[in-house]
């Protein structure tokens, strides 16, 4: 029977699983976002939140504990100086999982794990200017073509004068 066995095995040996999650949490904290399968994202979330909690503590022992798990010293520094101060008032829940659908190659459910207060770009504001009417687009193209024609003639007129000076 399955009692008190927390965590997912993910079809890997213990050493492989630990190494994979150490690499993933390092990449996640470095880029503040990671795309992976749903099962890995759910496991990575708990590890990443523990690392951010260590960063919030901020003492020497917490720094050493984080450095023992995170593979890159620059990422540990980023965790303690940039990431953790953002969440001083927040008592947990530093990450979110956004499900993307399935991966075409193997039909695996894929999701994005990202930090909650990361800067989000507004999607609707960028979409509205891109949808301009076709008539409005045609007029600037014609005007641009008219402007380019005189510019193209000017260098041609100067070219013979340049040749005459080189012949003389």
Swiss-Prot record:
Residue ranges, annotated region (Disordered): 123-144, 149-168
Low complexity bias locations: 127-144
Source organism, top-level taxon: Bacteria
Cited InterPro entries: Ribosomal_bL17 (IPR000456), Ribosomal_bL17_CS (IPR047859), Ribosomal_bL17_sf (IPR036373)
Any GO BP: translation
GO molecular function, one term: structural constituent of ribosome
GO CC terms in record: cytosolic large ribosomal subunit
Residues that span the membrane, as ranges: none
Keywords: Ribonucleoprotein, Ribosomal protein
Family: Belongs to the bacterial ribosomal protein bL17 family.
NCBIfam families per the UniProt record, alphabetical: L17
Record PANTHER family: LARGE RIBOSOMAL SUBUNIT PROTEIN BL17M, RIBOSOMAL PROTEIN L17
Assembly and binders: Part of the 50S ribosomal subunit. Contacts protein L32.
Protein name as annotated: Large ribosomal subunit protein bL17
